[in-house]
């Protein structure tokens, strides 16, 4: 297994899911840097909310991922690998993967895809509480533009995540150990 793909709408707490996997010995953590961290006290205490590379339109990596299905496997892997220099499985996180589950499954059939879902209003509320457009990493303002557009995008991403879950099934972990 070369990659673990993760899809979740902003505010779905998908980054928390990723952190539970990230510190495993088998994960390549070379994408981590102080520039790729976001700390916030939304939970009541200062906590690391985002760590490592995020891939989405308008962000540091994955600018073309809105149309990822128009690119070759080799072009995609070159972009996946760009922030990494180490060994191990690479976690590739993208909100827009929600719309491209079929493409990921077809091109990387041996790589797991983690779908993180949370109700639309809960996603938007948590994202706003965590800093919304003031979040310093990853940057949301270029692609997501404003709160109205963000709300629509969260709805669309969650819809496609639920549809992919219905199409492909999978496991629903009961706790962090199941991850």
Give residue spans per PLM region:
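Short boundary motifs at domain starts and secondary-structure transition points
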Residues: 80-84
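Short, high-confidence coil segments that cap the C-terminus of an alpha-helix
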Residues: 1, 86-89
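PAPS-dependent sulfotransferase catalytic core
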Residues: 1-79
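N-terminal/domain-start segments enriched in small and hydrophobic, helix-friendly residues
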Residues: 66, 85-86
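PAPS-dependent sulfotransferase catalytic domain
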Residues: 88-178
């Amino acid at each position: 297994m070369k990659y673990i793909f993760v899809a979740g709408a902003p505010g779905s707490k998908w980054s928390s899911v990723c952190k539970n996997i990230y510190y495993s010995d088998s994960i390549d953590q070379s994408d981590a840097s102080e520039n790729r961290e976001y700390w916030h006290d939304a939970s009541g205490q200062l906590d690391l909310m985002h760590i490592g590379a995020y891939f989405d339109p308008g962000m540091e990596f994955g600018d073309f991922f809105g149309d990822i299905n128009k690119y070759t496997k080799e072009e995609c892997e070159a972009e996946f690998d760009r922030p990494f220099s180490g060994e191990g499985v690479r976690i590739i996180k993208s909100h827009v993967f929600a719309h491209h589950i079929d493409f990921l499954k077809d091109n990387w059939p041996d790589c797991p895809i983690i779908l993180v879902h949370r109700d639309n209003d809960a996603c938007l509320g948590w994202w706003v509480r965590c800093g919304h457009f003031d979040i310093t990493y990853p940057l949301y303002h270029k692609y997501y533009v404003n709160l109205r557009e963000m709300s629509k995008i969260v709805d669309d991403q969650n819809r496609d995540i639920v549809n992919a879950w219905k199409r492909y099934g999978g496991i629903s972990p009961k706790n962090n150990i199941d991850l």
